[in-house]
Amino acid sequence: MTLFSCLNKENFSEIPVIEYKSLQVKGSDIEVQISFTDGDGDVGFKDGEEQFPYGPCDEYHYNLLVDPYYLLDGKFVKGTVLDYSSKCYPKPLPDTGYFPDTLGYYYRLAYIVPEGKDKSLQGDIYITLNEVMNEFPNDTIRFSIYMYDRSLHKSNVVQTEAVITP
């Protein structure tokens, strides 16, 4: 994942706003580019910032989330896989008693230090989704992307275009 940012004297919302820019297939990987704005400049985590509510088992441990969806019977459904490697086991779903098994690509953006009086941030984020073309063979997939700032404001959700995997 690569992050580029620049400071502008503009009035952006304190709630992050993201915009989908592009998707490129690079071998078995996919690179997605989004742009973002944040009016109060509280994007990203400082080194070691893992206390509540950003701890490893907390809901806000990750601040950039990419969820895959695959085409099933003419509708896009969220990609799932059983993942027993997590140290944080989710609670069972109340209606079924089963555990959620959602697959996602989750990241922790690095802290960006706003400079000057204007703390607003604007920039581009490049996300590399490794081995995606192998994870969903012979499928049509797309991705939903959103982010959180340190004030726990959730951005809008954007979707990529669909990609057909070999």
Predicted region positions:
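C-terminal motif of bacterial Sec signal peptides marking the signal peptidase cleavage site
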Residues: 2-5
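Non-catalytic macromolecular-recognition regions in eukaryotic signaling proteins
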Residues: 7-166
